[in-house]
Amino acid sequence: MSTRAPASADEFLTGLKGQRVLVTAGAGGIGFAIADTLSRLGARIVVCDVSDEALAAAPSKIDLVAAVKADVSRDEDVDRLFEAVEKKLGGLDALINNAGIAGPTGGVDEIDPADWRRCIDICLTGQFLCARRAVPLIKAAGGGSIVSMSSAAGRHGYAFRTPYSAAKFGVIGFTQSLAKELGPHAIRVNAILPGIIEGPRIEGVISARAKQVGISHEEMTGRYLQNISLRRMTSPYDVASMVAFLLSDAGINISGQSLGVDGNVETL
């Protein structure tokens, strides 16, 4: 760990080269941007995903050690994933708990309990299942990082997206608890709260919400942007930059934090 200021921009994000990193849901969206960014900075990356198509395409776009099909909500898939991590990387320095789904859109009296459970299982329980396997490896490495994806919906209640918001609030509690538990082992644990991420998922959410309230897709998009101080959606690479910072030596004393990368979402 450096005790002086960096001499140049090139020296700022040190400590990433050679890091062994697992990125869940890393073959598309935010996960792809994270894997791409960390790989370019010299990290050795394993990704998992549920999409065969995305997994097949990712290695031609990113320098990956391995791409593994796994559903993080399934114990047996997570066990198999970490067997691959140990075999391919020989250990682990960082876990990026990125996997998640949008979950159902609807009033609490309209949501199917199976859809509720599926959202919680992937967005929250999956982070637990991965962390419980990652922690012994990161301890054995002498310390490292866990970065988990929450959401602006983990800071603001989100009407008609109750399962998703509940899961993302849970991620923050999980993160703060792990930070206290793992700090003595030199493991930093932080949550990132992305805002409205550009891409097909939010387009689907906006369409569903617009249909519910009886307005056009364009008008609903404008309403979403009106609640963001910077009046812009968030790029997956905005989030990836924060992950790189947290995993680098620049983030050596940051733990237990919930960091918004959202253009300052004022409300949802």
What is the meaning of each model-derived region?
Residues 2-13, 102-105, 156, 232, ...:
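Short C-terminal tail/terminal secondary-structure segment
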Residues 4, 191, 199, 215-254, ...:
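C-terminal helical subdomain
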Residues 131, 167, 175:
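Active-site helix of classical SDR
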Residues 151:
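Residue(s) in the substrate-gating loop at a strand-loop-helix junction
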Residues 183, 188, 254-256:
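Short, small/polar-rich loop/turn modules that mediate ligand/substrate recognition or access, typified
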